[in-house]
């Protein structure tokens, strides 16, 4: 009857007709230059209609064995969660041509066990309380780098665990957060940031009776931590960890008075005055560069005004256009002024997060203009923004403040203090639902050069075809510290394309990441599948360049490129799965 047929020596097949039937899933077979041959199996347990559990096992002929589990549940709107755990046992392996560095020997020749935990939870308790939790934790960064299929996961430098509870009490929004995050710089240095706990109380704006004024309040208690960790290996490959730690308790209160002015349609003015009071139980001795037990406090006022307008607009009809019957161009200039009173003890404050890095005795003037182009489509009949162009620059009376301006991506790159920030340009275009693109760049007006440029976009043709692309470049600027070292420049291109034809019976994926600066592919991946009425097959091939991880890992061996091949079969009513390292483009999802 024209139904394709294939044979396997052994096949297990649950006969239940329920789409969520309990049973074994189809295994995945693979081969890797680094991991050896692999076999991945999974058992799916449909506990109930609202929860399930998947147990997984991976066998690698060279890299050992792994066990994993994924639990998912949905109790109702706003109450759901998932948790994934994985344990990997790697035997002692000495790869040919391993680097002679002591650290590389220790990483490549000794057996080790590692684990990872990933999860999200969101739970509502009544109508006023919500609990959230998130975990993205791994015990060994080198496992992430060498096992993960997704390059974003392989180059992930941070691991984090966080929990948060919010509630509304007597008109106030309360939040309690406990978080811990570690960011790696290579596999021998890292920085830890955390709060245990961070408790905040916030009131919404309330009008003052009889006056056009609004008042709000924010207060916070936080026990914050920042650690610098470095690991050095001795002659026997045994690591020695050095720790530099800063921690303190902090009390912060911030009342705000806002004065709006919205009587003119073509121009709006919002002004506010805030008082900030902060106390730290510990401080920083600038001469000895050490944390001391003496407390320190800080008090300052902040005055802020933002003008938007005058807004100019022009509308014109296009009766002969097949795209839109009418266009509108809106020009929206804006300027804001912010004055922060003097902070005389800035050098005595421990710099742990953003609140601690505020500089005083300065004025910031921010100015920019936004152009918006809107079109009334003939088909949909509604107006959509097809193009927007936004430019922004800040001026500070204190040049030091530009080094802490989080509105600009290049502020924390070791550039010399300057009163003018670069000009930020963001262009977004979306002429249809199927096409969109974004361009971002920062231009240094002092040196007449672009610091960074990035662009990304998407083109799709319904469910049949979709492609995304991205480009980013960190450019060389002669004389500008942080951008005048050619070895630290970056230039990347990435793309991902998927297609589905014949009612999704045939499809495929191709994606790549290319390092233009060093003229090499970081990774290339090809996936193809065929689904018939009764069965199907999925094949995947990936070439992953370990040399692209040179800025993160000291692990070096003769395997410069890991070539990975995976294959899996499907049958009607019997699903397949992706292991924890993302074969077939997933991340533990079946």
Language model regions located:
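Outer-membrane beta-barrel proteins and related beta-barrel translocases across Gram-negative bacteria
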Residues: 1-590
């Amino acid at each position: 009857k024209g139904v394709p047929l294939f044979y396997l020596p052994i096949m297990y097949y649950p006969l239940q007709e329920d789409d969520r039937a309990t049973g074994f899933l189809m295994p995945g077979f693979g081969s890797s230059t680094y991991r050896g041959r692999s076999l991945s199996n999974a058992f799916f347990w449909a506990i109930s209609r609202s929860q399930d559990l998947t147990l997984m096992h991976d066998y690698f002929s060279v890299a050992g064995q792994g066990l994993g589990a994924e639990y998912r549940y949905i109790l109702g709107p706003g109450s759901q969660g998932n948790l994934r755990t994985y344990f990997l046992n790697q035997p002692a392996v000495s790869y040919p041509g391993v680097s002679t560095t002591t650290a590389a020997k220790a990483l490549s020749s000794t057996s080790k066990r590692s684990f990872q935990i990933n999860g999200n939870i969101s739970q509502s308790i009544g109508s006023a309380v919500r609990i959230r939790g998130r975990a993205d934790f791994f015990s060994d960064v080198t496992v992430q780098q060498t096992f993960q299929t997704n390059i974003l996961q392989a180059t992930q430098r941070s691991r984090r665990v966080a929990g948060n509870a919010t509630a509304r009490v007597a008109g106030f929004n309360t939040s309690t957060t406990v978080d811990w995050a570690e960011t790696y710089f290579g596999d021998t240095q890292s920085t830890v940031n955390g709060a245990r706990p961070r408790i905040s109380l916030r009131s919404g704006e309330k009008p003052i009776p009889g006056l056009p004024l609004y008042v709000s309040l924010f207060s916070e208690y936080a026990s914050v931590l920042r650690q610098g960790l470095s690991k050095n290996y001795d002659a026997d490959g045994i690591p020695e960890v050095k720790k530099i730690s800063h921690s303190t308790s902090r009390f912060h209160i911030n009342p705000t008075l806002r004065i709006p002015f919205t009587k003119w349609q073509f121009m709006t003015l919002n002004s506010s005055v805030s008082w900030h009071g902060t106390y730290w139980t510990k401080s920083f001795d600038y001469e000895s560069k050490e944390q001391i037990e003496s407390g320190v406090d800080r008090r300052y006022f902040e005055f802020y005004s933002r003008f938007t307008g005058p807004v100019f607009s022009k509308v014109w009809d296009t009766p002969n256009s097949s795209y839109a019957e009418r266009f509108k161009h809106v020009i929206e200039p804006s300027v804001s002024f912010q004055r922060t009173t003097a902070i005389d003890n800035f050098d005595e404050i421990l710099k742990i997060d953003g609140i601690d890095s505020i500089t005083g005795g300065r004025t910031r003037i921010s100015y920019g203009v936004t152009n918006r182009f809107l079109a009334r489509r003939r088909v949909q009949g509604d107006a959509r923004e097809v193009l927007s162009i936004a430019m922004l620059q800040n001026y500070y009376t204190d040049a030091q403040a530009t080094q802490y301006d989080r509105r600009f991506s290049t502020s924390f790159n070791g550039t010399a203090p300057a009163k003018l920030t670069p000009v930020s340009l963001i262009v977004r275009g979306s002429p249809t639902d199927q096409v969109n693109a974004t361009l971002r760049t920062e231009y240094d007006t002092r040196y007449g050069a672009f610091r960074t440029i990035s662009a990304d976009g998407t083109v799709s043709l319904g469910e049949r075809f979709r492609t995304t692309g991205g480009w980013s470049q960190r450019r060389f600027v002669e004389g500008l510290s942080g951008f005048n070292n050619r070895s630290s420049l970056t230039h990347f291109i990435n793309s991902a394309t998927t297609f589905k034809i014949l009612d999704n019976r045939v499809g495929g994926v191709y994606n790549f990441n290319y390092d233009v600066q060093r003229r090499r592919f970081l990774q290339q991946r090809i996936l193809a599948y065929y689904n018939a009425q009764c069965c199907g097959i999925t094949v995947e091939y990936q070439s992953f360049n370990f040399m692209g991880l040179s800025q993160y890992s000291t692990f070096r061996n003769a395997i410069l490129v890991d070539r990975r091949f995976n294959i899996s079969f499907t049958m009607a009513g019997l699903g397949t799965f992706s292991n924890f390292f993302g074969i077939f483009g997933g991340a533990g999802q079946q």
